[in-house]
Amino acid sequence: ILAGGRGERAKPITLQSADYIRSKALIPFAGRPLIEWIVEACRDQGIRRFYVVAQGVENRSQIKLVLGHGERYGVEIDYSRARFDPYNVGSGAATLHNLEQWNLTGTALVLPVDSLFEFSLDKLLAAQRDSDAVVTVAAVSRTPEEIAGKYGVMRTTAERLVCGFLEKPRLPVIEREFPEITQPQGPRTLATNAGMYLIDCARLRLAARTPELIRLAQQRLDWGNDLLPRLVGLGHRVAVEPIARLGDLGNIRDYLGTIGDALGGLYPQMDRALGAPASTEPRYWIHESSLRSKDHITGTTLAQKIAEGSVVIGPGVRIGRHVEIGAGVRLRGTDVGDGVDLHEGAQVEGSVLGDSAVIGAYAHISDSYVGPMVQVRSDARTPVRLEALSAVGDGAQLWSGTRLSGVSVYPRLRVPAVSGVPTGTQLTSSDDILQWV
């Protein structure tokens, strides 16, 4: 598991304070750190030995605190040695250096820690065996419009062997290089790299012992941009095998989209891990302790309020432990962490509410992230509104009347009743906030 990234694109989700970043592996996802889902999804397909490539003191200690050595999960987990951190320059270099460190010679699955995968290990193994490939690339099919300027494309033969790459091509280039996609009866999707690789460790280690790859592994060597093209250029067999789905978690938009897809049933492996929903029509999960919780105003339980219709839970909702929900609350497509307070009249859609967040009365939150311990001090007269990929970091406070659209608020900040802050603004300090007061 390649877990050394700093999570810069996902700020403020990855921030515990303005100057302390948590590992991407610990991004909260449906009630658990992301890396737990990854380990369990692999374990359930028969993988019992894990190697975590970490980077730096905080990254390594944070992950180890969650996973330990795998005892809780019935697996074995080892960690990269700290003295090799300076040599982990890029995902490809990190892989090659640690294959040598652990002296791995069998078959291994390499995957990043900031994505959610729906895949079949058996199909990847079969593709590797049938093609006699050094590397089998897990591929996701995407339309030209999805690919343009964002994803690299792989050229493949009829035998699903990679024969070339196009790095983030624009739409005209895609149409020129793949004319079949413009034909009425032609394919409408192309294979893109999902960032997951099944490798023959011994053969890959041998292939990497060329002067060029040895030099690059000391400078910068990424899987997609560097290692794969050079392996293909040197004549090594690199195969492609489609997987069902990939969800990126590296930025706010993709994070919210992926968790929405997961709660919407598009990741069957995660569905099984979540367990049976509390309701199948609409489909949602509510922990038993939350169904029994009484709000402090009406004194009625959540189960009673759902039954009488004063609280409406739509599809794609997960509610964690000991959540208190007031009358008039509406939820749809939202993940609600443990210990959250949702006061009367609050409406939340397409969002994530972190553990112990307090959402004030009549707040309107859509397509946004609200971190743990955030206080949204909304009221009926001056409600708070968050929308359009806004993100509020751990422990921040939003005062009544605040309206943010596509704005990020860093942890621990206190935001007064502001509006009109331009979309894309990052409020990282009190000085940033003062510009808009």
Model-assigned labels for residue ranges:
Residues 80-82, 138, 241-243:
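Conserved beta-strand termini and adjacent loop/short-helix elements that scaffold enzyme active sites
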Residues 64-67, 117-211:
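Conserved core of the sugar-phosphate nucleotidyltransferase
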Residues 115, 202, 206, 211-437:
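Left-handed beta-helix
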Residues 48-50, 134-135, 237:
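Residues at the starts of beta-strands that form the adenosine-phosphate
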Residues 1-2, 7-20, 27-123, 156, ...:
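Conserved N-terminal catalytic core of the sugar/cofactor nucleotidyltransferase
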Residues 83-90, 144, 171-173, 246-248:
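A short acidic, often aromatic-flanked loop/helix-cap motif at beta-alpha or helix-coil junctions
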Residues 44, 101-105, 118, 130, ...:
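Alpha-helix termination/capping residues and helix-transition junctions
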Residues 25, 76-78, 161, 237-239:
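Conserved beta-strand segments of alpha/beta enzyme cores
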